[in-house]
Regions:
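Generic alpha-helical secondary structure signal
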Residues: 7, 16-17, 49-50, 81, ...
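Bacterial Sec-dependent N-terminal signal peptides
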Residues: 1-35
Length: 428
């Protein structure tokens, strides 16, 4: 239930190579190094091309390279921020006879290919880097095909227009970017661009049913066949314990879950309360367990002798309506022990500021969501009437449901763009 972001890690990913397109995205310690992937894709391109030169192989291709580099230089209206210096330098060299010697052609050729392939990638799937992502798949072969098999007579501008995202919210953001934002307003620009890149990601990873839990909005939505079926408020991680961005799948739902309190919460928050109030454990339905999961008689423990550093036990909260996880837990695959869950503290959903959890996502309408995902196996009456120590049950979903825990600092309502507070300071 707790997640601590590595403060040394960058909030945005660095350039793939010194000449690759940059964008606004978030880092992921679980992603393969981008430089290695880009080198591999470029090499794959030349293997398929059967020629060590592509752009310098003919005047036609040189002209095409100039078109691409011009597009990359001026792609700000698409929310794709490029390394203009590299693009300009190569383009000027291309149109200036004799400025590229034979030995440099191979290097320049690959630089152009890397720039163009990365542009095609960002254009169609965005450059969002979730902290953990098991949904997105490689489309490198598609981008290579698009570059090698351009339609006869189709300009680069026409190709980009054809491949550009057609998502409704994306188009609203794109038009807003074009019409409303001054280049000098870098914060708003970054927020809109981040929103555009998320919409590109969703379009590239289209799913029938899915959940989006957006951290800055502290809201979650469930979509079925692209129709919004449930929208609810959430409580997400605090600034101290931020919720990570995750693209994963809900695999099962637990009814009447136990809460195995993370050790850091146990020693920093619960232990002082137990030492101060002798009946705290009983009043809040906690058991003390050892490392093997065996329940310990807490009345025989010398509580005053324990500190954060030497407390050898764990706390486990019994099932029931007063459990911190409520009566439902939605498990999703990720390395951070993050999940969605109900809660016994409903009052938090009435607040505007809902960045209060240790990292997990509390749902305002968990019963409705569970009923949608497991219509024949969820009895809302039983869940509402559950008592202390009700038996916990894990129910596998017939098919896993994608869930995207996102950091989108803008919201689209109709044709209006709403800017959200950058609660974790990731946009800067």
């Amino acid at each position: 239930m707790i997640y601590i972001r590595d403060k040394k890690g960058s909030a945005y990913y660095n350039a793939l190579l010194c000449f690759l397109i940059l964008g606004f995205s978030f880092s992921s310690s679980y992603a393969q190094p981008d430089t290695l992937k880009k080198d591999s894709v470029v090499q794959q391109f030349y293997t398929i091309n059967h020629d060590p030169l592509f752009w310098f192989s003919s005047d036609k291709n040189r002209n095409r390279a100039t078109e691409w580099l011009t597009m990359i230089e001026t792609a700000g209206y698409l929310g794709i921020v490029s390394d203009k210096y590299a693009a300009v330098q190569i383009r000027v060299a291309l149109i200036s006879n004799g400025t590229i010697d034979e030995n440099s052609k191979f290097q320049r050729d690959r630089q152009i290919t890397g720039l163009v392939l990365n542009f095609l990638k960002v254009l169609q799937e965005g450059n969002i880097k979730f902290d953990y992502d098991e949904v997105n798949v490689s489309r490198d072969s598609l981008y290579i095909h698009q570059l090698l098999e351009s339609k006869p007579g189709e300009s680069v501008s026409q190709l980009v227009s054809r491949l550009d995202c057609k998502d409704r919210e994306y188009l609203v953001l794109k038009n807003f970017l074009k019409d409303s934002i001054s280049v000098k307003d870098t914060i708003k620009y970054k927020k809109v661009v981040t929103g555009m890149n998320y919409r590109r990601y969703f379009s590239a990873n289209q799913k029938k049913d899915y959940i989006i839990a957006n951290i800055p909005a502290a809201e979650a939505s469930y979509y079925s066949n692209d129709f919004l079926k449930i929208k609810m408020r959430t409580v997400v991680g605090s600034k101290k314990n931020p919720t990570p961005t995750i693209a994963s799948y809900i695999t099962n739902i637990v009814t009447f879950p136990h809460w195995n309190v993370p050790h850091s919460i146990a020693v920093k928050e619960l232990l002082p309360k137990v030492q101060k109030h002798e009946n705290y454990l009983e009043q809040n339905n906690y058991d003390v367990v050892n490392a093997k999961g065996k329940v310990i008689d807490d009345s025989k423990l010398n509580w005053k002798s324990y500190t954060e550093k030497n407390f050898p036990y764990f706390f486990r909260q019994s099932t029931g309506p007063r459990n911190a996880l409520g009566v439902l837990k939605f498990n999703l695959q990720n390395p951070f022990s993050i999940f969605l869950h109900s809660t016994s503290l409903q009052s938090a959903f009435t607040k505007d500021y809902r960045f209060l959890s240790h990292g997990c996502v509390r749902l305002a309408k968990p019963l409705e969501l569970a009923k949608e995902l497991l219509p024949d196996q969820i009895d809302i009456k039983v869940l509402k009437s559950g008592k202390k120590n009700t038996e916990s049950k894990t129910i596998d979903l017939p098919r896993k449901i994608p869930v995207f825990i996102t950091y989108i600092p803008v919201k689209v309502i109709g044709k209006k763009v709403i800017f959200l507070k950058d609660i974790y300071g990731l946009v800067n």
